[in-house]
C-alpha cells in the first residue's frame, strides 16, 4: 500500500530520508516502509523504520495563524512528514533514492526482508508490533550458535521483566527446532506467583488469544513442569507452600553434598570484599570439608575423630571446638587443620558469619538429599521467595554451580539449559563481591559453548557486572527511570528511544538484536498460565466410566 513519496525538501541519504505522507494515510512511529528507486540502470529497494513523525502548517508564519486557519480565514496546507531510518538496502547500492519516489508500507515478504527475517535460519516469536505484525528474534543469537544470553532491564512492578522472560522462554520451548532437547530453570524470587505456571489462566482475554494465534503459539500453560520449594520447618518431606501435589517437591542437600561440592562458599553474602582474610578461612574450611568427605564412607561425613557430622549444627560445633582448642593450645593441630595460619580473631569473624548464615540455610542441609533435578523435566521452578537473602544466594549459587559443572563434564551443548534469574544486580553486581558472581560470569562468558543460556533481569543494567551485560546478544527494555536510561549501557537506544523508554506501558518492550540495526517496540500478550492462585482455572475431571451411563 502506497503511503507517500520521498521528499526533496530535505537532504536524502542512503541511511535516512524524509517522506511526505499522502492524504488519507496514517504513518506512525515504528512503521516499516520501503521505497523502490531506479539508481542508474538498477532497481534498488530501501527498507526502513519510521523514527520521527511531524505535522505542521505550510504557509503560516505566526503562532496565532493556527487559530485563523481553524476558522478558515487563512488558506494553508497541513504538512504530514515522517523520517525513515534505513534497515536494509537490496542490492547494496549505497546511493540515495530520488525525490518523488513512491513509499509503500512493508507487508508480507517485504516486511520480512526489511527486518532480515528471510535471512534468519531459525526465528522465534518475540511479540507483535503496533500493526499486529509478528516480531521475531534470531534463535541462533540466543541458543549459543552465533550468540547467547538475554538481558532484560526495567523498573520494578512496571516494566514486566519477569513476564517477558517467561513469555520468551515459553516461545522457545514451543517453537524452537531443538525444543525437545531444551530445559528451563526459573528462580522464583518474589511471592509464590510462579507456582502455577502449569495451570490455565482464567483471566486471559480474547485479544491476547488472538496475539498468541498470530504468533503461531498455543494459548496454553507450560507443560511438564516441576516445582521445587523449601521444606517445611515441621516436616522436611513437605514443601513450605499452599500447593501440595505430586508436581511440587521440597529441595535440600545432604551434609555430604555440602562438603563435597564446596557449598559453604555460598553462605557468605556480599559485604565481605574488604575482609580478605575471611576468604582465606572460607577456602581452608571448604577444602577441609572436601577432604573429610573423600575419607568418609558413602553417604556419611565423618570428622577426624570418626564422629558423624549430620547437620550444619554439628559442623558449627566442630568449628567452635577447633577455635577453643587453639585458645588452650597455641600449637593446636586441630585448629590448623580447619583454619590454617589464620589469626584467632579472623576465625571468630568467620564463625560469627557462619553461625548467622546457618539460621537461614540450616533447613536446606540434612542427612539425606533431594536437590532440584533439572534434567528430569522440561521446566523446573525453584522457589526461593521465602528465603532470607543469604538463603537465596546459597540456593542460586549451589544450583548454578552444579548445572555448570555437569555441563562441563558432558562437554556438549545439548541438552541446553535456559536459566531465568531476576535481580541479577544482586548476584553479579558491578561493584563489590557476591559469592555467585564468578558462577554467573562463567555462564556469561563460557555458557554459550556449553549450552547454558542466561535470561537475566534487573532493574538497572548499570549496576550489573558489565561483562554479563556485554555478553548478552539480545537486549530487552521495559519502562525505565529517566536518569538510568542515559547510561552507556543503553547506547543501543538510537534516535528517540531513550525518551520513549520512560513512557512505555505494561506489556510493551524495546527489543534490540544484532540482526537488525534499529531497536523495535514490541507488545506481548498476557500470560496464558496462571501467575497466582486466584487466576487458576478450575479443572473438571470426568471419570472414564462416565460414558457407560
Residues covered by each model-derived region:
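Phosphate-binding and hydrolysis-coupling loops of NTP-dependent motor/remodeling domains
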Residues: 32, 37, 79-102, 498-549
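Conserved beta-strand position immediately N-terminal to the Walker
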Residues: 150-151, 382, 455
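Conserved P-loop NTPase catalytic core
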Residues: 209-244, 470-491, 502-505
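Basic- and hydrophobic-enriched, low-structure N-terminal and domain-boundary segments
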Residues: 1-155, 168-171, 175-181, 413-415, ...
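Conserved ATP-driven motor cores of ASCE-family P-loop NTPases powering translocation/secretion/packaging/pilus
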Residues: 442-528
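Glycine-rich phosphate-binding loop of nucleotide-binding enzymes
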Residues: 126-226, 437, 466, 511, ...
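Substrate-engagement module of ASCE P-loop NTPases
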Residues: 171-175, 212-218, 402-408, 439-455
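P-loop NTPase motor domains
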Residues: 182, 186-187, 191-197, 220-221, ...
Amino acid at each position: 500500500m502506497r503511503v507517500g513519496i520521498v521528499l526533496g525538501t530535505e537532504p536524502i541519504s542512503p541511511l535516512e530520508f524524509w517522506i511526505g505522507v499522502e492524504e488519507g494515510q496514517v504513518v506512525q512511529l515504528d512503521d516499516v516502509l520501503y521505497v523502490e528507486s531506479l539508481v542508474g540502470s538498477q532497481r534498488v529497494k530501501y527498507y526502513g523504520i519510521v523514527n520521527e513523525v511531524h505535522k505542521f502548517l505550510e504557509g503560516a508564519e505566526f503562532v496565532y495563524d493556527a487559530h485563523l486557519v481553524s476558522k478558515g480565514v487563512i488558506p494553508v496546507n497541513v504538512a504530514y512528514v515522517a523520517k525513515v531510518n534505513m534497515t536494509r538496502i537490496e542490492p547494496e547500492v549505497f546511493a540515495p533514492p530520488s525525490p518523488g519516489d513512491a513509499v509503500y508500507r512493508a507487508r508480507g515478504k517485504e516486511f520480512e526482508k526489511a527486518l532480515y527475517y528471510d535471512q534468519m535460519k531459525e526465528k522465534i516469536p518475540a511479540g507483535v508490533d503496533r500493526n499486529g505484525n509478528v516480531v521475531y528474534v534470531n534463535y541462533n543469537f540466543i541458543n549459543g550458535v552465533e550468540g547467547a544470553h538475554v538481558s532484560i532491564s526495567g523498573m520494578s512492578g512496571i516494566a514486566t521483566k519477569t513476564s517477558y522472560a517467561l513469555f520468551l522462554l515459553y516461545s522457545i520451548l514451543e517453537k524452537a527446532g531443538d525444543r525437545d532437547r531444551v530445559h528451563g530453570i526459573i528462580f522464583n524470587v518474589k511471592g509464590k506467583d510462579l507456582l502455577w505456571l502449569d495451570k490455565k489462566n482464567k483471566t486471559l482475554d480474547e485479544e491476547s488469544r488472538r496475539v498468541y494465534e498470530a504468533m503461531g503459539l498455543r494459548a496454553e500453560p507450560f507443560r511438564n513442569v516441576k516445582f521445587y520449594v523449601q521444606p517445611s520447618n515441621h516436616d522436611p518431606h513437605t514443601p513450605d507452600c499452599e500447593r501440595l501435589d505430586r508436581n511440587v517437591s521440597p529441595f535440600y542437600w545432604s551434609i555430604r553434598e555440602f562438603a563435597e561440592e564446596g557449598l559453604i562458599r555460598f553462605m557468605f553474602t556480599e559485604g565481605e570484599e574488604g575482609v580478605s582474610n575471611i576468604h582465606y578461612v572460607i577456602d581452608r574450611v571448604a577444602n577441609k570439608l572436601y577432604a573429610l568427605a573423600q575419607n568418609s564412607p558413602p553417604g556419611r561425613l565423618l570428622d577426624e575423630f570418626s564422629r558423624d557430622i549430620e547437620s550444619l549444627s554439628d559442623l558449627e560445633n566442630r568449628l567452635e571446638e577447633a577455635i577453643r582448642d587453639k585458645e588452650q593450645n597455641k600449637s593446636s593441630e586441630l585448629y590448623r587443620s580447619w583454619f590454617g595460619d589464620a589469626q584467632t580473631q579472623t576465625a571468630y569473624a568467620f564463625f560469627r558469619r557462619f553461625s548467622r548464615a546457618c539460621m537461614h540455610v540450616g533447613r536446606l542441609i540434612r542427612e539425606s538429599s533431594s536437590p532440584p533435578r533439572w534434567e528430569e523435566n522440561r521446566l523446573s521452578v525453584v522457589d526461593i521467595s521465602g528465603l532470607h537473602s543469604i538463603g537465596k544466594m546459597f540456593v542460586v549459587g549451589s544450583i548454578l554451580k552444579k548445572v555448570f559443572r555437569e555441563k562441563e563434564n558432558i562437554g556438549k551443548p545439548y541438552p541446553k539449559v535456559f536459566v531465568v534469574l531476576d535481580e541479577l544486580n544482586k548476584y553479579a553486581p558491578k561493584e563489590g563481591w557476591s559469592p555467585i558472581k564468578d558462577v554467573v560470569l562463567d555462564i556469561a562468558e563460557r555458557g554459550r559453548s556449553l549450552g547454558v543460556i542466561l535470561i537475566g533481569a534487573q532493574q538497572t543494567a548499570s549496576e550489573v557486572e558489565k561483562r554479563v551485560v556485554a555478553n548478552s546478544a539480545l537486549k530487552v527494555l521495559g519502562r525505565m527511570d529517566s536518569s538510568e536510561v542515559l547510561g552507556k549501557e543503553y547506547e543501543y537506544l538510537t534516535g528517540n528511544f531513550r525518551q520513549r523508554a520512560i513512557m512505555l506501558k505494561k506489556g510493551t518492550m524495546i527489543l534490540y538484536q544484532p540482526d537488525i540495526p534499529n531497536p523495535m517496540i514490541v507488545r506481548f500478550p498476557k500470560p496464558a498460565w496462571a501467575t497466582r492462585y486466584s487466576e487458576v482455572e478450575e479443572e473438571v475431571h470426568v471419570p472414564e466410566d462416565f460414558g457407560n451411563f
